[in-house]
Curated annotation (Swiss-Prot):
Pfam families: PALP
Any single biological process term in GO: isoleucine biosynthetic process
Similarity-based family: Belongs to the serine/threonine dehydratase family. DsdA subfamily.
Gene3D superfamilies: 3.40.50.1100
Catalytic activity: D-serine = pyruvate + NH4(+)
Protein name, UniProt field: Probable D-serine dehydratase
InterPro entries in alphabetical order: D_Ser_am_lyase (IPR011780), Ser/Thr_Dehydratase (IPR050147), Ser/Thr_deHydtase_PyrdxlP-BS (IPR000634), TrpB-like_PALP (IPR001926), TrpB-like_PALP_sf (IPR036052)
PANTHER family, per the entry: D-SERINE DEHYDRATASE, THREONINE DEHYDRATASE, MITOCHONDRIAL-RELATED
GO terms, molecular function: D-serine ammonia-lyase activity; hydro-lyase activity; pyridoxal phosphate binding
Enzyme class: lyase
Cofactor dependence: pyridoxal 5'-phosphate
Organism of origin: Geobacillus stearothermophilus (Bacillus stearothermophilus)
Keywords, comma-separated and alphabetical: Lyase, Pyridoxal phosphate
């Protein structure tokens, strides 16, 4: 817990904190942002680590294709579409009276097979890695084998001797629960107070043990970690500090490169790429950012998006204290409809590794998320959960907020913006039950009718 004096000292040093503490929307440009060639020197991971993760996912593709028929057409590769959303771009420009230069795309991790969110990348990857490690160590397989053999009673019996434990606000729990149970593991998911009921119900229907907590995400992770430590057959998936989750997310960047090439979209010195990533604890956006920087270096600019009531990564980066600060220290309640982003304390791993790599962070109010959700349905017929819309707000904020424009000018991008590509990373949505999604849409329409006047003024 930070003292009152420390908070006051920071408010003096960072005047933007006053606005953050009032739970108002802000756009923050990272003053520690460096050229990637310089920034990577302090990062303990390299491209070979990501390539190794990609290779492992390839080994598991025959198993995935067999166990999850919906992945067969993609031959067991878990990937999502990248789509142009020009109608939504026009709607954004109209809603917020802002001209967005360049093209706007949506990366639909909301529609990833198996668990319908970005967590299908990191979560599924880490479980598969653990399964491979166990199977190799026990002589069940060798690296050259066809991993489709894992979809058998023999392997399910073997994996049932082991358990997986994770703490989650929802989507990570879904991905680990679904893949873990399918392999045969005993899975326990500890869920925080803000987790949606339908996510708990879905997990239970797959045979996963769900333990509900009244506390917030960080306390839940602590409890899950403690429970796992008591059982020698248990493996704890650490959302706050896992390198394996991080690498699973990073693989996305190399696949995105191919998708952009297939769409004839150039990314180079004169064609900058801007990527806007919803951020909870930071593992998902952190891994994707690291991967994108490996692929595009300084030609890609990654911004994290957080709810106004849960800006944990923003506070960690701004103060340089990372996981030593929480949103509660600054008088914020960590309550948001963006359940996947309701995190009070950021990942130390991501904050430390990427403090010179993340271009900036902006915050979005729940009402803005709902308005964008309704607009996305009306313009593109794409259904997303509220947290996924945080990334879609990015281009408006970049062009409308003073700090966004300062970033563009400071990086010599002003004349290049007409050639820019903007990608909002849609993190979840396809598994939301129809009635819940309908209620989200109605809420968006209601707020739009009431307000209809854009974001709060940029600061």
């Amino acid at each position: 817990m930070m003292t009152k004096n420390e908070i006051q000292k920071w408010v003096k040093e960072f005047p933007l904190l006053k606005t953050i503490m009032a739970a108002e929307e802000v756009f923050w440009r990272n003053p520690k942002y460096h050229a990637f060639a310089q920034a990577i020197r302090t990062i303990p991971l390299r491209e070979r680590d990501v390539k190794e993760a990609e290779e492992r996912l390839r080994r598991f593709a025959p198993y995935i294709a067999k166990a999850f028929p919906e992945t067969r057409t993609a031959h067991g590769i878990i990937e999502s579409p990248l789509v142009r959303i020009s109608n939504m771009k026009q709607r954004l420009e109209k809603m917020f009276q802002t001209n967005i230069e360049g093209e706007l795309l949506l990366k639909c991790d909301s529609h990833l097979p198996i668990s319908g969110s970005i967590k299908a990348r990191g979560g599924i990857y880490e479980v598969l890695k653990h399964a491979e490690d166990l199977a190799l160590a026990n002589g069940m397989i060798t690296i050259g084998d066809d991993y489709a053999v894992m979809d058998s009673e023999k392997f399910r019996q073997f994996f049932s001797r082991y358990s997986l434990v994770v703490g989650s606000t929802g989507n990570l729990g879904l991905s680990i629960g679904i893949i873990g149970a399918k392999l045969g593991f005993r899975v326990t998911v500890h869920m925080s107070a803000d987790a949606k009921q339908w996510k708990k119900d879905l997990l239970r229907s797959k045979g996963v043990t769900v333990i509900e907590h009244l506390t917030d995400y960080n306390k839940v992770v602590e409890e899950a970690r403690r429970q796992s430590a008591e059982d020698p057959t248990s493996y704890f998936i650490d959302d706050e500090n896992s390198i394996h989750l991080f690498l699973g997310y990073a693989v996305a960047a190399f696949r995105l490169k191919k998708q952009l090439e297939d769409m004839n979209i150039t990314v180079d010195e004169n064609h900058p790429l801007f990527v806007y990533l919803p951020c909870g604890v930071g593992g998902g956006p952190g891994g994707v950012t690291f991967g994108l920087k490996l692929v595009y270096g300084d030609h890609v600019h990654c911004f994290f998006a957080e709810p106004t009531h849960s800006p944990c990564m923003l506070l960690g980066l701004m103060t340089g204290e990372h996981d030593r600060v929480s949103v509660q220290d600054f008088g914020l309640d960590n309550k948001t409809e963006a359940d996947g982003l309701a995190v009070g304390r950021p990942s130390r791993l991501v904050g430390n590794m990427l403090e010179n790599v993340i271009s900036g962070v902006y915050t979005v109010d729940d009402s803005t998320l709902y308005r964008l959700l309704a607009a996305m349905v009306e313009t593109e017929e794409i259904y997303l959960e509220p947290s996924a819309l945080a990334g879609v707000a990015g281009p408006v904020r970049l062009f409308r907020d003073l700090a966004g424009q300062t970033y563009v000018e400071a990086n010599g991008l002003k004349e290049k913006m007409k050639n820019a590509t903007h990608i909002g990373w849609a993190t979840g949505g396809s598994m939301v039950p129809k009635d819940v999604m309908e209620a989200y849409y109605r809420e968006g329409v209601r707020i739009e009718t009431m307000t209809g006047n854009g974001f709060s003024e940029g600061r």
